[in-house]
């Protein structure tokens, strides 16, 4: 049974989160959590929370056994960017894009 968990508008760019997502794709859930625990990136914490949510969803909604679960799919899409202005010299201004991302984790016991 496939179970999905999503984190929308995560405050990190999709490019940075994809680096972490690639580490756990296809792994067993226990191994993926261990990998994320020792990954020294902000995105690892975001992905870990979504993975734990997917595990809880599978256990509660589908009655799945945690030991059989695998990360079948994990993908990161770009979310909306917040536009900000950085004042510069001589009355100019630069645009700052604070990027967000949508993290989706799918776990399955197959």
Curated annotation (Swiss-Prot):
<comment type="similarity">
    <text>Belongs to the universal ribosomal protein uL22 family.</text>
</comment>
<keyword id="KW-0687">Ribonucleoprotein</keyword>
<dbReference type="InterPro" id="IPR005727">
    <property type="entry name" value="Ribosomal_uL22_bac/chlpt-type"/>
</dbReference>
<dbReference type="InterPro" id="IPR018260">
    <property type="entry name" value="Ribosomal_uL22_CS"/>
</dbReference>
<dbReference type="GO" id="GO:0019843">
    <property type="term" value="F:rRNA binding"/>
</dbReference>
<dbReference type="InterPro" id="IPR001063">
    <property type="entry name" value="Ribosomal_uL22"/>
</dbReference>
<protein>
    <recommendedName>
        <fullName>Large ribosomal subunit protein uL22</fullName>
    </recommendedName>
</protein>
<keyword id="KW-0699">rRNA-binding</keyword>
<dbReference type="Pfam" id="PF00237">
    <property type="entry name" value="Ribosomal_L22"/>
</dbReference>
<keyword id="KW-0689">Ribosomal protein</keyword>
<comment type="function">
    <text>The globular domain of the protein is located near the polypeptide exit tunnel on the outside of the subunit, while an extended beta-hairpin is found that lines the wall of the exit tunnel in the center of the 70S ribosome.</text>
</comment>
<dbReference type="GO" id="GO:0022625">
    <property type="term" value="C:cytosolic large ribosomal subunit"/>
</dbReference>
<keyword id="KW-0694">RNA-binding</keyword>
<dbReference type="InterPro" id="IPR036394">
    <property type="entry name" value="Ribosomal_uL22_sf"/>
</dbReference>
<dbReference type="InterPro" id="IPR047867">
    <property type="entry name" value="Ribosomal_uL22_bac/org-type"/>
</dbReference>
<comment type="function">
    <text>This protein binds specifically to 23S rRNA; its binding is stimulated by other ribosomal proteins, e.g. L4, L17, and L20. It is important during the early stages of 50S assembly. It makes multiple contacts with different domains of the 23S rRNA in the assembled 50S subunit and ribosome.</text>
</comment>
<dbReference type="GO" id="GO:0003735">
    <property type="term" value="F:structural constituent of ribosome"/>
</dbReference>
<comment type="subunit">
    <text>Part of the 50S ribosomal subunit.</text>
</comment>
<dbReference type="GO" id="GO:0006412">
    <property type="term" value="P:translation"/>
</dbReference>
């Amino acid at each position: 049974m496939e179970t999905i968990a999503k984190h929308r508008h995560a405050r990190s760019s999709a490019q940075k989160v994809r680096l972490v997502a690639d580490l756990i794709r296809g792994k067993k859930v226990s191994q993926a959590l261990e990998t994320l625990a020792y990954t020294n990136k902000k995105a690892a914490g975001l992905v870990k929370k979504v993975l734990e949510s997917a595990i809880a969803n599978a256990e509660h909604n589908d009655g799945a056994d945690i030991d059989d679960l695998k990360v079948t799919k994990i993908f990161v899409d770009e979310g909306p960017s917040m536009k900000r202005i950085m004042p510069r010299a001589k009355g100019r201004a630069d645009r700052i894009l604070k990027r967000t991302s949508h993290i989706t984790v799918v776990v399955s016991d197959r």
